[in-house]
């Protein structure tokens, strides 16, 4: 058993890597490029607000990303209303970025938790508009089911608040979400180190998206490689099937044939 032929499928598109990474907070564009390479990711999320899409004569973040190698996932980071998020997605599509989008509609600046009411509103509009929508949402099975029913291609519940590095705070609701929806479940936000990514994947989620966990590390390139390995290891462990947890010991060697 390996992860080689274990593909992540989103809206009919196949990806070999189950790790998605962001492009913000790096010390330089060169460091970002090296970290992307080390991560092994194929889907790269880009904040539309950070991309110069109006004046192509000026330097843009996209100048540093090989779009033949990576699938761009424009995101609506910084949007607090459905209207703003929809407008941002349409601008990204008109600029030729992608019609597969990571939809974020935030509730406030303190927690960066999603405003689910506005999120559902935006998702309905974008799906009708022909977008492939991957919404960042709270770890609420009911909201995730509503997003699936709207037509979202995946759901992306948070593991913990964005940039917090707190890891997977509520694995139980993540498991319920996986039982509730049929679309891919991608844990988004809160991953702080490789063990967090492995834990998420061991739960059986389809993928993990992160930015700060890599870009904010002391050595982002090394951490990108660690996250790459952790996601693969966690996925393989999930497919292999862990032993059940129990209170008492079980001998690993048989008692038959012992010397008397």
From Swiss-Prot:
Binding of 1-deoxy-D-xylulose 5-phosphate occurs at: 163, 189-190, 211-212
Protein name from the UniProt record = Thiazole synthase
Q: Which domain of life is it from?
A: Bacteria
Record-linked HAMAP family = ThiG (MF_00443)
Q: Name the keywords, alphabetized.
A: Cytoplasm, Schiff base, Thiamine biosynthesis, Transferase
This entry's Enzyme Commission designation comes to 2.8.1.10
Q: Name one GO molecular function term.
A: thiazole synthase activity
Q: Name one GO cellular component term.
A: cytoplasm
The answer to whether the entry has keyword Transferase is yes
Pathway annotation: Cofactor biosynthesis; thiamine diphosphate biosynthesis
User: Upper lineage ranks?
Assistant: Bacteria, Pseudomonadati, Thermodesulfobacteriota, Desulfuromonadia, Geobacterales
Give the similarity note.
Answer: Belongs to the ThiG family.
* Enzyme class name: transferase
* Source species of the chain: Geobacter metallireducens (strain ATCC 53774 / DSM 7210 / GS-15)
Per its database record, what is this protein's job? Answer: Catalyzes the rearrangement of 1-deoxy-D-xylulose 5-phosphate (DXP) to produce the thiazole phosphate moiety of thiamine. Sulfur is provided by the thiocarboxylate moiety of the carrier protein ThiS. In vitro, sulfur can be provided by H(2)S.
**Pfam families (UniProt xref):** ThiG
Where, per UniProt, does this protein localize?
Answer: Cytoplasm
**Active site, per annotation:** 102 (schiff-base intermediate with dxp)
GO biological process terms on file: thiamine diphosphate biosynthetic process
| Primary site of residence | cytoplasm
On whether Cytoplasm is a keyword of this UniProt record, the answer is: yes
Task: Describe its assembly.
Answer: Homotetramer. Forms heterodimers with either ThiH or ThiS.
Q: Which reaction does it catalyse?
A: [ThiS sulfur-carrier protein]-C-terminal-Gly-aminoethanethioate + 2-iminoacetate + 1-deoxy-D-xylulose 5-phosphate = [ThiS sulfur-carrier protein]-C-terminal Gly-Gly + 2-[(2R,5Z)-2-carboxy-4-methylthiazol-5(2H)-ylidene]ethyl phosphate + 2 H2O + H(+)
Coiled-coil regions listed in the entry: none
